[in-house]
Amino acid sequence: MTTSFYFLLMALGLLLYVCQSSFGNQHTRTFDTPKHRCGSEITNSYMDLCYRKRNDAGKKRGRASPLWQRRGSLSQLKARAKRNGAFHLPRDGRGVVEHCCHRPCSNAEFKKYCS
């Protein structure tokens, strides 16, 4: 193997690295990238985005909040949401399902439905 062959291999590798690093990041998601949320994803997003700030103090002390422990209980969350009206607040005449399931919404848009 000659020196020019190694040089060609190194140049090709460098070219592939530059192409991957400059064009490879266009499809990555950030924290606030709009996305579709349907079904249980709406519930999980509601728990994560709406109750995270309230529970941070408990997490720092090493305790999980009772609401977070009952995360899988959809009926309790539905009852709370119905009582608070969180999922029925009019936002331009649409609810959270119409706004975030039928078309993508960001976390900031989803937080508007927090009570």
UniProtKB/Swiss-Prot annotation:
It is found in: Secreted. Pfam families: Insulin. It comes from the Eukaryota. The modification 4-hydroxyproline is found at residues 34, 104. Is different from Con-Ins G1a (AC A0A0B5AC95) due to absence of amidation at Cys-114. The modification 4-carboxyglutamate is found at residues 41, 98, 109. SMART domains: IlGF (SM00078). GO terms for cellular component: extracellular region. Keywords: Carbohydrate metabolism, Cleavage on pair of basic residues, Disulfide bond, Gamma-carboxyglutamic acid, Glucose metabolism, Hormone, Hydroxylation, Secreted, Signal, Toxin. Expressed by the venom gland. Disulfide bonds join 38-101, 50-114, 100-105. GO terms for molecular function: hormone activity; toxin activity. Residues 1-24 form the signal peptide. One of its GO terms (biological process) is glucose metabolic process. Residues 25-29, 53-94 form a propeptide. Venom insulins constitute about 1/25 of the total venom of C.geographus. Heterodimer of A and B chains; disulfide-linked. Belongs to the insulin family. This venom insulin, from a fish-hunting cone snail, facilitates prey capture by rapidly inducing hypoglycemic shock. It is one of the smallest known insulin found in nature and lacks the C-terminal segment of the B chain that, in human insulin, mediates engagement of the insulin receptor (INSR) and assembly of the hormone's hexameric storage form. Despite lacking this segment, it both binds and activates human insulin receptor (long isoform (HIR-B)) with only a 10-fold lower potency. This is Con-Ins G1c. The lineage of its organism: Eukaryota, Metazoa, Spiralia, Lophotrochozoa, Mollusca.
